[in-house]
Amino acid sequence: MDDCRFETSELQASVMISTPLFTDSWSSCNTANCNGSIKIHDIAGITYVAIPAVSMIQLGNLVGLPVTGDVLFPGLSSDEPLPMVDAAILKLFLQLKIKEGLELELLGKKLVVITGHSTGGALAAFTALWLLSQSSPPSFRVFCITFGSPLLGNQSLSTSISRSRLAHNFCHVVSIHDLVPRSSNEQFWPFGTYLFCSDKGGVCLDNAGSVRLMFNILNTTATQNTEEHQRYGHYVFTLSHMFLKSRSFLGGSIPDNSYQAGVALAVEALGFSNDDTSGVLVKECIETATRIVRAPILRSAELANELASVLPARLEIQWYKDRCDASEEQLGYYDFFKRYSLKRDFKVNMSRIRLAKFWDTVIKMVETNELPFDFHLGKKWIYASQFYQLLAEPLDIANFYKNRDIKTGGHYLEGNRPKRYEVIDKWQKGVKVPEECVRSRYASTTQDTCFWAKLEQAKEWLDEARKESSDPQRRSLLREKIVPFESYANTLVTKKEVSLDVKAKNSSYSVWEANLKEFKCKMGYENEIEMVVDESDAMET
């Protein structure tokens, strides 16, 4: 880690614990525990909600969160496998009707700190997560501080919280001698920032894997004391004053390297010596945490440079589209690319392939956690992926139908759509949609990137229905498919959510529209009342 200039885990812990948030939170927890009821009060403009600890017989059994019906966390990023939480904590949260009691109490507040000790901490984390993950976020800021809280859920829950950009709202204070926060069940995973404390100071870790590693080290090296679970008041008030005092390094001379000096101070803050075996293990854990946290950030920065390097490929496709739109043949770039094999088509095809490889690599890196959990929520990548998909997917559809084996190939939307587009669709669904405005001109690119694939299916339905050999029953079934697409396409055109190439005189859509009109006239459908169509069903990809 020589390329790292500073190690800040010990400094971060010192700064955090010195703020009134932690002393006031613990005082609130203590009052709630004594009264055995939820305490809500204001201190210096901050509303504290302290949830009391509840003696429980059994913790450690996981249960899946409901994904249908009354969903507790609708705004939480969904992952596979299913996010799970401790069954006893979930049951207690529902029994105590915490969410019903808070909805009115917190109206008009600006900053709310949800806090709790032991099982009260787990309930506090659950409550804060419920507030933060609603479809409509609360009007106030939410922060959660727990003391000696048991772990709440599985790895999928931890990952979902991180990807939803909610992890920074949680801070868990844990004594290195307290057994309660360290679950023996390997299925449980931490989330948020962990502030490990001892009489010597504290260290902050915010990577789930590093927190688990620290738990394992403490299980084998730290002195285990059942009374430690009740000593958080001592730690909070002692450490908050310790920050104001000067620190002296106990391990001889301070290392010249500022990063190594920071690591050494962090090891001592947890009460370990830099020279003994336990201290070496803690040092390795802190260094690993730094490396794990930095690696995705650095890779994301490198990827931004790689994105810039493929920009010419995207511009090549844009220029190709513009040239096709202006051509005398009155065909859009979809039809040009599908029908012809000109020299300029070869060049744009190479750009299409280059972009596909780049985005396939990005998707793979996201899935293997090589990038930050919230990578896909960054504005740069939201816009870049959207622009890429709007411009390139029609060419991928054209290429598919250009080379398709009609007998065995099926359709593009029948399991042949590249995974990258399905993932980008999920990314876009997680973005707040701006209020819809009426377009005064046609879009620069068709807003439904699967429009041409749906048209190809509708073309086959119409071709089959037009055949003389088509029996009335089969023709009726085909009409039930054609009419929804017609309604959907008309809606897109009316709202001007298609590009001009869709309405070009000789485009596939214009030809299909003319053939449909002729077929209706021939069959006497023109004056019939068409069936009512669910437009949303028609527009499903």
UniProtKB/Swiss-Prot annotation:
<dbReference type="GO" id="GO:0071327">
    <property type="term" value="P:cellular response to trehalose stimulus"/>
</dbReference>
<dbReference type="GO" id="GO:0016042">
    <property type="term" value="P:lipid catabolic process"/>
</dbReference>
<dbReference type="GO" id="GO:0042742">
    <property type="term" value="P:defense response to bacterium"/>
</dbReference>
<keyword id="KW-0381">Hypersensitive response</keyword>
<dbReference type="GO" id="GO:0010105">
    <property type="term" value="P:negative regulation of ethylene-activated signaling pathway"/>
</dbReference>
<dbReference type="GO" id="GO:0009873">
    <property type="term" value="P:ethylene-activated signaling pathway"/>
</dbReference>
<dbReference type="GO" id="GO:0005737">
    <property type="term" value="C:cytoplasm"/>
</dbReference>
<keyword id="KW-0936">Ethylene signaling pathway</keyword>
<dbReference type="GO" id="GO:0009626">
    <property type="term" value="P:plant-type hypersensitive response"/>
</dbReference>
<dbReference type="GO" id="GO:1900426">
    <property type="term" value="P:positive regulation of defense response to bacterium"/>
</dbReference>
<dbReference type="GO" id="GO:0009625">
    <property type="term" value="P:response to insect"/>
</dbReference>
<dbReference type="GO" id="GO:0080142">
    <property type="term" value="P:regulation of salicylic acid biosynthetic process"/>
</dbReference>
<dbReference type="GO" id="GO:0005634">
    <property type="term" value="C:nucleus"/>
</dbReference>
<dbReference type="GO" id="GO:2000031">
    <property type="term" value="P:regulation of salicylic acid mediated signaling pathway"/>
</dbReference>
<dbReference type="GO" id="GO:0051707">
    <property type="term" value="P:response to other organism"/>
</dbReference>
<dbReference type="GO" id="GO:0009617">
    <property type="term" value="P:response to bacterium"/>
</dbReference>
<dbReference type="GO" id="GO:0016298">
    <property type="term" value="F:lipase activity"/>
</dbReference>
<dbReference type="GO" id="GO:0001666">
    <property type="term" value="P:response to hypoxia"/>
</dbReference>
<dbReference type="Pfam" id="PF18117">
    <property type="entry name" value="EDS1_EP"/>
</dbReference>
<dbReference type="GO" id="GO:0010618">
    <property type="term" value="P:aerenchyma formation"/>
</dbReference>
<dbReference type="GO" id="GO:0016740">
    <property type="term" value="F:transferase activity"/>
</dbReference>
<dbReference type="GO" id="GO:0009627">
    <property type="term" value="P:systemic acquired resistance"/>
</dbReference>
<keyword id="KW-0611">Plant defense</keyword>
<feature type="active site" description="Charge relay system">
    <location>
        <position position="178"/>
    </location>
</feature>
<comment type="similarity">
    <text>Belongs to the AB hydrolase superfamily. Lipase family.</text>
</comment>
<dbReference type="GO" id="GO:0009751">
    <property type="term" value="P:response to salicylic acid"/>
</dbReference>
<dbReference type="Pfam" id="PF01764">
    <property type="entry name" value="Lipase_3"/>
</dbReference>
<dbReference type="GO" id="GO:0050829">
    <property type="term" value="P:defense response to Gram-negative bacterium"/>
</dbReference>
<dbReference type="GO" id="GO:1901183">
    <property type="term" value="P:positive regulation of camalexin biosynthetic process"/>
</dbReference>
<dbReference type="InterPro" id="IPR041266">
    <property type="entry name" value="EDS1_EP"/>
</dbReference>
<dbReference type="GO" id="GO:0031348">
    <property type="term" value="P:negative regulation of defense response"/>
</dbReference>
<keyword id="KW-0808">Transferase</keyword>
<dbReference type="GO" id="GO:0009862">
    <property type="term" value="P:systemic acquired resistance, salicylic acid mediated signaling pathway"/>
</dbReference>
<keyword id="KW-0442">Lipid degradation</keyword>
<dbReference type="GO" id="GO:0010310">
    <property type="term" value="P:regulation of hydrogen peroxide metabolic process"/>
</dbReference>
<dbReference type="InterPro" id="IPR002921">
    <property type="entry name" value="Fungal_lipase-type"/>
</dbReference>
<keyword id="KW-0963">Cytoplasm</keyword>
<dbReference type="GO" id="GO:0106093">
    <property type="term" value="C:EDS1 disease-resistance complex"/>
</dbReference>
<keyword id="KW-0539">Nucleus</keyword>
<keyword id="KW-0378">Hydrolase</keyword>
<dbReference type="GO" id="GO:0005829">
    <property type="term" value="C:cytosol"/>
</dbReference>
<dbReference type="GO" id="GO:0080151">
    <property type="term" value="P:positive regulation of salicylic acid mediated signaling pathway"/>
</dbReference>
